[in-house]
């Protein structure tokens, strides 16, 4: 996987932006036990996740940190930079998988610029993204198809 390769070539931190109910930290393989994992998301979601983990008696590994973050707020990155387990000198693997769909185009650009300002050269960012029409505000027009004919 991309994360495993990043760790193999030197990544020491895994930042999961918009972590939601991501479960990597709780099923992490041995090779990942030596990296710091930061789950970043809104307070309510992180709180609910912790409640669910606790009610199912799933312990939080010692290398996992929850950081309440709202990427729309100014200076959200201070929560990461100021966290005692985060080391700005160590390469990071940053996952934005599933997050871009919730951001405007400008918020996405700002997020990438902010990340590039606090992770060192050699770090990685992985993301998925919608096609160019996703950000258009124009509503979709219905198309009716009957027997392979467009009406």
Model-predicted segments: where are they?
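Alpha-helical subdomain
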Residues: 1-19, 23-151
């Amino acid at each position: 996987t991309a994360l495993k390769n990043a760790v193999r070539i030197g990544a020491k931190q895994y930042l999961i932006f918009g972590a939601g109910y991501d479960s990597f930290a709780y099923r992490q393989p041995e090779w990942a036990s030596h990296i710091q994992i930061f789950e970043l998301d809104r307070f309510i979601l992180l709180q609910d996740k912790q409640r669910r983990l606790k009610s199912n008696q799933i312990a939080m590994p010692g290398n996992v940190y929850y950081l309440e973050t709202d990427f729309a707020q100014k200076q959200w990155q201070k929560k990461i930079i100021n966290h005692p387990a985060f080391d700005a000198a160590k390469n990071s693997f940053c996952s934005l998988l599933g997050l871009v769909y919730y951001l405007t185009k400008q918020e996405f650009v700002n997020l990438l610029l902010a990340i590039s300002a606090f992770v060192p050269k050699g770090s990685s960012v992985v993301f998925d993204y919608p096609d160019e029409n996703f950000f258009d505000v124009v509503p979709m027009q219905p198309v009716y198809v009957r027997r392979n004919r467009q009406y």
